């Protein structure tokens, strides 16, 4: 792995570096997108979005915008995470973001629970095919869902802590609703960030209540991190 190769370099530095010739190509974030384009011969926009936990959602919005701007008819978009490593676990543990409920790992990650104390590290990946509506209809494609809008923002607050009032999350949802030309009352489900941390979950709830008002109590809400 990249981490092992870097670690090996510093461990054996006195004997000289032994880098694999593919070290740099494997290191860059957009190599995953590059592999997809090379395998399938795709010549459209090709890059990786790097925005921490929002990367996959941002890639979805980027794909949506490229299609509605006429830059492409079909785009493969998605994301992956493989952070279970010494550096990944050590770093998140130092931030006190990981649950210490080791005796009950199956239910340790419990977003919005009063007894939450952090998340459980996991890995995974997913890709979606986004296609211009008329293009999909013309070829008789099975359409699973329609993307109607997206929003982006930032807390502009702290390196690791979310804004205590959830300002960034509030702006994101407002921007998404505006872009989709939807009213808050038309939303019935939110898949939240839900880190299961004492600070993060509170700010997210505040943001939802601020945007949706009384309708917030009618929403179905869940976090993938609880699964």
Predicted regions, residues:
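A glycine- and small-aliphatic-rich helix-loop capping segment at beta-alpha/alpha-beta transitions
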Residues: 1-16, 66-69, 89-102, 164-168, ...
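Conserved beta-ketoacyl condensing-enzyme motif
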Residues: 1-51, 80-89, 184-200
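Active-site-proximal alpha-helical scaffold in enzymes
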Residues: 32-40, 45-81, 119-141
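Conserved small-residue
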Residues: 36, 56, 63, 92, ...
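Acyl-CoA/ACP chain-elongation machinery
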Residues: 73-117, 150-164, 192-202, 218-227
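Condensing-enzyme catalytic core mediating Claisen C-C bond formation in acyl metabolism
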Residues: 103-180, 189
């Amino acid at each position: 792995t990249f981490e092992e190769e870097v670690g090996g370099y510093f461990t054996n530095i006195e004997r000289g570096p032994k880098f694999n010739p593919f070290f740099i190509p494997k290191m860059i974030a957009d190599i995953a997108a590059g592999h997809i384009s090379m395998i399938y011969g795709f010549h459209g926009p090709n890059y990786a979005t790097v925005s921490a936990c929002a990367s996959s959602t941002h890639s979805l919005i980027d794909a949506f915008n490229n299609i509605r701007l006429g830059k492409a008819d079909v785009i493969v978009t998605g994301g992956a995470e493989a952070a279970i490593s010494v550096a990944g676990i050590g770093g998140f543990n130092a931030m006190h973001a990981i649950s210490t409920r080791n005796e009950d790992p199956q239910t340790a990650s419990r977003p919005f629970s009063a007894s939450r104390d952090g998340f459980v590290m996991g890995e995974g990946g997913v890709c979606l095919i986004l296609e211009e509506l008329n293009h999909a209809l013309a070829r008789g494609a099975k359409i699973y869902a329609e993307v109607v809008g997206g929003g982006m923002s930032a807390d502009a607050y702290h390196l690791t802590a979310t804004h205590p009032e959830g300002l960034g999350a509030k702006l994101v949802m407002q921007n998404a609703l505006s872009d989709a030309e939807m009213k808050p009352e038309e939303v019935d489900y939110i898949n939240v960030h839900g880190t299961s941390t004492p600070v993060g979950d509170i700010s997210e709830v505040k943001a939802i209540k601020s945007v949706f008002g009384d309708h917030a109590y009618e929403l179905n809400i869940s976090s993938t991190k609880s699964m």
